Amino acid sequence: MRDSAAKNMGKQFDEAIQFGALYKALKKCCRGVRWKPSTAGYEHYALANTYRLRQELLHGSYKLSSYQRFTIREPKVRDIVATRLRDRQFQRALCDAVLYPSITSSFIYDNGACQRGKGVDFALDRMTAHLQQYYREQKQAAEAAIGHRLGRFCAGGWVLACDVRHFFDSTPHAVAKAAVAKRVYDSETVRHNARIIDSFGGERGIGLGSQVSQLNQLAVLDT
């Protein structure tokens, strides 16, 4: 199965760094932030910047820029590691062409994390559907036990609400890289993904603030 997948997916990195794919990725990255001088300046020379980026990727001379680090305090305190626009352009193209479809293909339908078309409303609708199904099943079981239909019924049950404490900060780089390599069969994509992970420094901790980081963490949870 892996040989078949490798045969079909071996060209994905090449597709991700096509000029059109990179240009489209840049336009997506600029949405909602064109008011920033740095974004406006980069987009003003979009064609030239995209061409230069593609040439560096083709010839293996591409290097990640330094990160912008800052702290947000709402809804809770988080340290953000922001990727420069040039790097986000490449990473968005890589996510769209390879990482997103490869990593999310194994997720269950109810998983709405970083899923296209699956926002908060989707998650609430699915939770409502599951609660309604649970209520019907419990009521039917109670009616079967007593031999007649019930009017009003209160179904007892539990909902598990949890969070992984310091998940991004505590993830070992080796674990994240292995989780992605298990799902992505394109060697160039795996190599660049590993470089992005290692760029955060140390052996633990994935920077919070990019789509690549989010997809890596979802792959870890799905291991």
Task: Describe these PLM feature segments.
Residues 112-124:
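Long, hydrophobic, well-ordered secondary-structure blocks that form the structural core
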Residues 20-23, 47, 51, 87-92, ...:
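Non-catalytic, well-ordered alpha-helical scaffold segments
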